[in-house]
Amino acid sequence: MKAQDLREKNVEELNEELLNLLREQFNLRMQAATGQLQQTHTLKAVRRDIARVKTLLNEKAGA
């Protein structure tokens, strides 16, 4: 997910995206814990996407 795409969204859409990413992260962590996760790099990518969304939410809250 690109930061430019996220910047075009409003706060409500970003909150929805954050919720979806947190759910996805939870599911990936459960798969990793049970040994079902084949592509472990997806955990890192989702974690960074969450950070991007949170950063943009903080920027929009300050503006």
UniProtKB/Swiss-Prot annotation:
GO terms of biological process kind: translation
Disulfide cross-links: none
Keyword check for Phosphoprotein: no
GO MF term set: structural constituent of ribosome
SUPFAM superfamilies: Ribosomal protein L29 (L29p)
Pfam families linked: Ribosomal_L29
A Gene Ontology cellular-component term: cytosolic large ribosomal subunit
Keywords: Ribonucleoprotein, Ribosomal protein
Keyword Transmembrane helix belongs to the record: no
NCBIfam families, per database record: L29
PANTHER family with a match to the protein in the record: 60S RIBOSOMAL PROTEIN L35/50S RIBOSOMAL PROTEIN L29 (PTHR10916), LARGE RIBOSOMAL SUBUNIT PROTEIN UL29C (PTHR10916:SF0)
Family as reported in the entry's similarity comment: Belongs to the universal ribosomal protein uL29 family.
Protein name: Large ribosomal subunit protein uL29
Organism: Aliivibrio fischeri (strain ATCC 700601 / ES114) (Vibrio fischeri)
Gene: rpmC
